Amino acid sequence: MPKMKTHRASAKRFKRTGNGGLKRHHAFTGHRFHGKTKKQRRHLRKAAMVSRSDLKRIKQMLSQMR
């Protein structure tokens, strides 16, 4: 059976943490910042963690990623 390939689009969007979790960027950060408060923009800059319900599915796509 051939090796599982890493889903390249997902590999560019997620980073693994030391404890085995995954970091991701926030949505809504591309444009139209005039409609968002300063506080909202500040919080959107920080990375977020992938939720536990999505973790198993995403890790399967990133099977070869270290």
UniProtKB/Swiss-Prot annotation:
PANTHER family linked to this entry: 54S RIBOSOMAL PROTEIN BL35M (PTHR33343), LARGE RIBOSOMAL SUBUNIT PROTEIN BL35M (PTHR33343:SF1)
Instruction: Write out the ranges of the annotated region (Disordered).
Output: 1-50
Cite the HAMAP family for this sequence: Ribosomal_bL35
Q: Which GO terms describe its molecular function?
A: structural constituent of ribosome
User: What is the protein named?
Assistant: Large ribosomal subunit protein bL35
BP terms from Gene Ontology: translation
Q: Compositional bias (Basic residues) spans?
A: 1-46
Which keywords label this protein? Ribonucleoprotein, Ribosomal protein
What organism is this sequence from? Lactobacillus delbrueckii subsp. bulgaricus (strain ATCC 11842 / DSM 20081 / BCRC 10696 / JCM 1002 / NBRC 13953 / NCIMB 11778 / NCTC 12712 / WDCM 00102 / Lb 14)
Q: Which domain of life is it from?
A: Bacteria
Q: Which InterPro entries match?
A: Ribosomal_bL35, Ribosomal_bL35-like, Ribosomal_bL35_CS, Ribosomal_bL35_sf
One GO cellular component assignment for this chain's record is: cytosolic large ribosomal subunit
Q: Gene3D superfamilies under this entry?
A: 4.10.410.60
- Nucleus recorded as keyword: no
Name the family: Belongs to the bacterial ribosomal protein bL35 family.
